[in-house]
Structure formats: C-alpha cells, structure tokens
C-alpha cells in the first residue's frame, strides 16, 4: 500500500484572492497595519482556530497579529499565499544568521548552542547539503521496512491497553506517544535502558512548560546524543544513526559531529509532535463524524489510505509552520512584509481554503484524490517534512489496527479542539 499519492500539476486558484505579487486597493504595499488579536476575531480561537482563520482569509491573505505576550507576527492564511510563503527565499528559517534582525519578538530564539545544526534551522545551500546527506539513508525503502515492527508494537501496546480493568484509557498515553517514541528510539539505535530519559527530554522540548525548561532539557539531551554518536562510530549497528555517521556523498562530504547529534535531536522532536498530533486528531475526527467512522470500519483495507490523507488535510497535525523571518521586504498576497518581520504560515487554514478544496469543512474519507491531493499538512518546498512517509505509515497502521481490534471503541467524554488527550472506553 503506497504511502503517498501520485503528484499532479497544481494551478493556483483564480478566485477572489490576489496573486502573490499583486497589490490590492484595500491593502496596498507599504500601508501600515494595526496588529489584531486573534481572540478578538474569535474568543474561541484556542479551542477551535478554524472560524477565526476563515474570517481573516475573507479579508485577505496576510495579517499582522499579536500574541499574548505582546509579540507581533505576520500571519499568512489561504492556500495560494501559504504555498508562496513556504517557498519564498526571502523568508528564512536560519535564526542563527538572521535572528538579530527579527522585529516583534522580545528576543530571537536561542539557536546558537549544540543540537541546533539541523536542516529545519537552515536555508539553502546549507539546508540542501544537510537534506541530501540525510535523504541518502532515511529512504522510503528504510521506512517501508519498518512496517512489520510498527505493527507488532501497535499490537503490543493495544494488548496492554485493552487489559485495563475499567476498560478506559487515553489513546495518546497508551498508544500514540509510546509508539512514536519507541519507533524513533529503535530507528536511532537508542538502548532500552535510556528511553525513559529520552521520553522526559522529548516531552519538555516538544511541549515545554517554560522556555527555560526546554533549554535545560536540550542541554541534557545533547551530551547523551554526543556520547551515542561516539559509541555508534566505534561500533556501528544497523540503525539510522550509524548509517548517517558513515554516509558520504559523491564528493566525500559527510555530516560533522554537531550535525549528527542535531539530526538525531530533530528526529526526536519534530517527529514526536507531528505524529502524535496526527494520530490523536485523526481519531477525534473519526469519532466526531460517525458516518465516516462506520464507512471506514466497514472497509478499512480499501479506505484507510484515503482516510489518512483526509485526516491530515482536515486537521493538520501542526497548525502553523515553524516561524520564519523576512530577510528583505517581500510581497505576499498584495501585502508588504517588512525586513525583520516574523512570519507564521497557517498550514491548517490552507487546507480549509474553499479556493483549493471543495467543501473544505466537510470530513470525507472518500473525498476524490484530486480534491485532497496537495494538502500542506507536512509543509511544502525545501522544508517539506522528510519524515512524512513514516508518519503516514504509523497513522495507517494505528487507525487500521484500532478499527480491527476495538470494534466498540468510543470517546469517553467531550473534547475541545485544543485538548491533546483522547480518552476512550470500550
């Protein structure tokens, strides 16, 4: 069963939104903007951001918004504008180099220390080099070979969950999170005895209780990963980290020490958030649409791949792409974002844009491929998620196995959109 659908050419919408370089009468380039509070747009934004995004999109594709701490960001909404922003060379992910010019933040993110030399924090050509070396080993063949192990892990975790005497559990704690953590640890060759510590670091960095706690967790993880790299260099295994240590391109280029441990750190953190959110949001979408759940239960073998793609489109695992900083003035959707502007790209809204997806607020696991293809759940352009095939594989196995083994599974109580838990009963 393929992890991805074949690509098809994309033609930008010709509806009411202006093209990426066009000025509009309402918002000509250079016009000052007053920052808006998303909670003023919709007080329920934290629980369900989609109505606020839709209101903003109806006014235009780029908006200056303010955060709870007084931060100011340029928020990009709508499919065409988001694709443009994701591929704009004027919007940088290299905070090490361009962070000092950022405006609207109390301070730029601290990215100078060890563990930050990964491709998510680099622009081409540095990013191109790092991704090329990583892609030599993190291949679709390696990911496909993981499916039997992912299936065994899923079954073992479900065995433990279904043994609960009160027939209740949280799917995130019982299944989604331990599955993802175990898969990443096995992929990197991390010994069983070290995984509890790894879980603590991952929890704190992916969902920090404070900026200081996240930095402290990274500071603890980096020496461990450095030692792991040294051990794998001395005694290679058949894991991904060992392969990355020894891979080189045609010119003899290799990842250096900091790049190796940074790559391991990226796999831990980026994969944690996207996959766990994907599984939890996907299950919640199914339970919120009993007709679609019934369809999938009746024919999971045929429908599960399309259902996974619809889950990704309908409620993106990560609502906004990692922030970028404008290294030069850039026009997107008729609005000039000034040099130093910090830009958030609303992936979740892009995939609910009626200019690209018919009836986008309808959850339809039988949506025709042409009507779901091209979603931005995993980003777009050079920073498109390298781990997307693995996330799709895990989602497909988990959803299919849940439906097969837990025919009476149901949500255990009401959940808001922002709730990361998925309490269930059976």
Enumerate the language-model features and the residues they cover.
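Cytochrome P450
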Residues: 1-426
């Amino acid at each position: 069963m393929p992890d991805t659908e074949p690509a098809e050419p994309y033609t930008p919408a010709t509806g009411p939104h202006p093209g990426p370089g066009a000025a509009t009468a309402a918002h000509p380039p250079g016009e000052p903007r007053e920052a808006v509070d998303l909670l003023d747009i919709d007080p329920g934004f934290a629980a369900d951001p989609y109505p606020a995004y839709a209101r903003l999109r109806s006014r235009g594709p780029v908006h200056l918004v303010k955060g709870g701490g007084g931060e100011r960001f340029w928020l990009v909404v709508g499919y065409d504008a988001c694709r443009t922003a994701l591929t704009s060379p004027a919007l940088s992910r290299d905070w090490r180099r361009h962070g000092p010019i950022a405006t609207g933040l109390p301070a730029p993110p601290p990215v100078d220390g060890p563990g930050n030399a990964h491709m998510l924090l680099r622009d081409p050509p540095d990013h191109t080099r790092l991704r090329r070396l990583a892609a030599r080993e993190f291949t679709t063949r390696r990911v496909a070979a993981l499916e039997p192990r992912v299936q065994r892990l899923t079954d073992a975790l479900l065995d433990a969950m279904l043994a609960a005497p009160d027939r209740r559990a949280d799917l995130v704690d019982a299944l989604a999170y331990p599955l993802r953590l175990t898969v990443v640890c096995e992929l990197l060759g991390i010994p069983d005895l070290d995984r509890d510590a790894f879980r603590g670091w991952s929890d704190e960095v992916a969902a920090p209780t404070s900026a200081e706690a996240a930095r402290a967790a990274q500071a603890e993880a980096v020496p461990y990963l450095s030692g792991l790299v040294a051990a794998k260099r001395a005694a290679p295994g058949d894991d991904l980290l060992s392969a990355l240590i020894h891979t080189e391109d045609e010119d003899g280029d290799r990842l250096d020490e900091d790049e190796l441990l940074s790559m391991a750190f990226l796999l831990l953190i980026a994969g944690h958030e996207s996959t766990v959110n994907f599984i939890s949001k996907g299950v919640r979408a199914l339970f919120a649409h009993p007709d679609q759940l019934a369809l999938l239960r009746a024919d999971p073998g045929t429908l599960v791949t399309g259902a996974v793609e619809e889950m990704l489109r309908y409620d993106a695992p990560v609502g906004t792409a990692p922030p970028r900083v404008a290294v030069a003035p850039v026009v997107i959707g008729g609005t000039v974002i000034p040099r130093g502007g910090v830009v958030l790209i609303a992936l979740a809204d892009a995939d609910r844009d009626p200019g690209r997806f018919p009836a986008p607020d309808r959850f339809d696991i039988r949506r025709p491929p042409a009507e779901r293809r091209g979603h931005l759940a995993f980003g777009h352009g050079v920073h498109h998620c390298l781990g997307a095939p693995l996330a799709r594989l895990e989602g497909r196995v988990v959803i299919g196995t849940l439906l097969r083994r837990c025919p009476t599974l149901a949500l255990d109580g009401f959940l808001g959109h922002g709730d990361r838990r998925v309490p269930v009963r059976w």
